[in-house]
């Protein structure tokens, strides 16, 4: 294999439509292009002219797996614009809603999408034939995450109970306690999940990432905090555009993100873990140590293990919130719209999301900017592939493509119903 061009005309399980192009010349990697068409650009356009209070419901439709991330980013940005002060009781309910999303999303990715790659199965259906109890446990764990979203958010997919200022309706303590035993089971299942993920075989592949994440002084980040990196960034969401920029590339409709004056960066579970390890619970740290996960991770293939730890954290955090729950005096606070610009960053399961809205005096959105984690990671995925390909270049074409699938899947780009996300066509020089 001296010269070879590999074209992948369609990538499923990414945020929109995409393709992969790999060029090998004289047994060396000549070019890597991950081409992604990104739906959120359309959402920015048709948000213009809409009332501010429609933003949470509209942006939730960007993703069916992590709608809460887009809703939370929208409500926080609007509340930032209007100077709204949110009571702690509502803030805690929002964290609980986010716990549900992390549990269901991480579980879906870990067991249904990524584990089959490591275990040599085409998909989870084939995996279930040999590991039925593992898959049954995964389905129950995911359902518990969905149940939390349903209870707090009004429904599992595209929740309808979230509003700028709080919620339309809040659960009673009895409502939450009905889920308590299930979440206790989920906590134990999450421990087993982290151990299962750590038992998989990982290639020796490490990258010097600039990790970027929301960082909160007191808690593992969901909704609030500063934007920080392991290489010196420490800014508020209002300063995002001064430090990060998006750029057009010829081979993709999606925008590449980079740090100004530097280059690509990493968002997602590994970035969060590396920057927020000390905010994890004692049990999370204990399990991480037991399975050989240090305080920092730079092997992207081990993102599946970090997702296991974050699933455990989400279960523990959900139990803590329920234990201390007190119904707010009102489901929401009053919002007084004004001419303003609002900014927010929250942590989707896949990584940090940035929202910026400019609103006029009538409360209508004049401009919107949404930067999802997949677009932020696109340049880093290409970098991973460029550095990883030389380690698998002598494998058969089938094995090489399979390894590339794993490398892309580390980032959980998005979910679709496709069985495989690479349809391979080879053009020989």
Q: Which residues does each PLM region occupy?
A:
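Active-site bordering "gate/hinge" segments
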Residues: 1-352, 372-429
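A translation/RNA-centric and nucleic-acid-associated enzymatic feature enriched
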Residues: 350, 355-357, 367
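Active-site catalytic microenvironments in core metabolic enzymes, especially phosphate/sugar-handling
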Residues: 363
């Amino acid at each position: 294999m001296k010269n070879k061009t590999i074209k992948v005309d369609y990538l499923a399980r990414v945020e929109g439509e995409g393709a992969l192009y790999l060029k090998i010349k004289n047994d060396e990697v000549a070019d890597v292009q991950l081409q992604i068409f990104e739906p959120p650009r359309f959402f920015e356009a048709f948000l213009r002219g809409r009332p501010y209070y429609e933003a949470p419901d509209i942006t939730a439709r960007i993703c069916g797996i992590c709608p809460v991330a887009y809703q939370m980013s929208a409500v926080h940005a609007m509340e930032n614009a209007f100077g709204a002060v949110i009571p702690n009781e509502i803030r805690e309910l929002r964290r609980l809603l986010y716990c549900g999303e992390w549990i269901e999303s991480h579980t879906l990715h870990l067991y249904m999408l990524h584990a089959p790659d490591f275990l040599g199965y085409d998909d989870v259906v084939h995996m279930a034939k040999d590991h039925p109890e593992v898959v049954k446990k995964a389905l129950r764990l995911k359902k518990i995450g969905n149940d939390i979203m349903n209870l707090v958010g009004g429904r599992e997919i595209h929740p309808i109970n979230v509003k700028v200022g709080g919620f339309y309706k809040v659960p009673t303590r009895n409502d939450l306690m009905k889920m308590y035993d299930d979440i206790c089971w989920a906590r134990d299942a999450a421990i087993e999940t982290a151990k299962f993920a750590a038992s998989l075989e990982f290639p020796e592949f490490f990258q010097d990432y600039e990790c970027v994440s929301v960082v909160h002084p007191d808690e593992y980040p969901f909704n609030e905090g500063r934007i920080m990196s392991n290489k010196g960034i420490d800014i508020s969401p209002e300063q995002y555009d001064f430090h990060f920029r998006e750029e057009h590339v010829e081979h993709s409709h999606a925008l590449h993100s980079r740090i100004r004056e530097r280059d690509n960066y990493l968002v997602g579970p590994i970035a969060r873990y590396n920057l927020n390890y000390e905010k994890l619970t004692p049990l999370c740290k204990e399990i991480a140590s037991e399975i050989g996960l240090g305080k920092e991770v730079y092997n992207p293939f081990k993102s599946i293990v970090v997702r296991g730890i974050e699933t455990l954290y989400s279960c523990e955090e959900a139990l803590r919130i329920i234990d201390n729950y007190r119904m707010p005096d009102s489901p929401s606070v009053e919002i007084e719209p004004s001419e303003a610009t609002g900014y927010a960053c929250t942590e989707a399961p896949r990584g940090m999301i940035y929202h910026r809205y400019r609103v006029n005096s009538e409360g209508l959105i004049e401009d919107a900017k949404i930067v999802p984690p997949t677009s932020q990671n696109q340049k880093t995925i290409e970098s991973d592939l460029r550095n990883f390909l030389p380690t698998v270049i002598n494998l058969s074409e089938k094995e090489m493509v399979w390894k590339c699938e794993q490398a892309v899947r580390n980032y959980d780009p998005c979910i679709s119903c496709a069985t495989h996300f690479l349809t391979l066509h080879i053009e020989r020089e």
